[in-house]
């Protein structure tokens, strides 16, 4: 299970146990490495990936290109090391974001009376946020969002559109969120739950 267990005589002193551990750290590290190496790659053949909340299976084919091809419930790409496959998925998420998110933003903007024109959109992989809204009106959405169900993507879009009106997270901002998307708190919780349960990257 990847854990290292230490057994010792019942009367061992804590200081003696700690000294033993310090003296054998190199040995412990060597023992732990095989467990780390055994962890499956997230890009292994047959692994599950997500697009708009739907599960897709990855197939690594020798005659495929480096770009990811979407065919039904299968994603096809050429084999490669983990870095190359991660880069291929970043490109795929960018492409799918550009294909799907503008229409979703247009729908959600229709629920926001203060949005008179669709804001400029950008997409990029972000590790710490789902999106951001600049004061000049440019919306940037996390390209990894394209993995999530549309209702959860809509929550992030509404959040950023509300920032066009309220550039903060104060009471006025949340009042606006509540007016436009009354179930926003449930959607926010579902977003985190989906990420946690399915191991989907932020």
Q: Which role does the model predict for each range below?
A:
Residues 160:
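Walker B catalytic acidic pair
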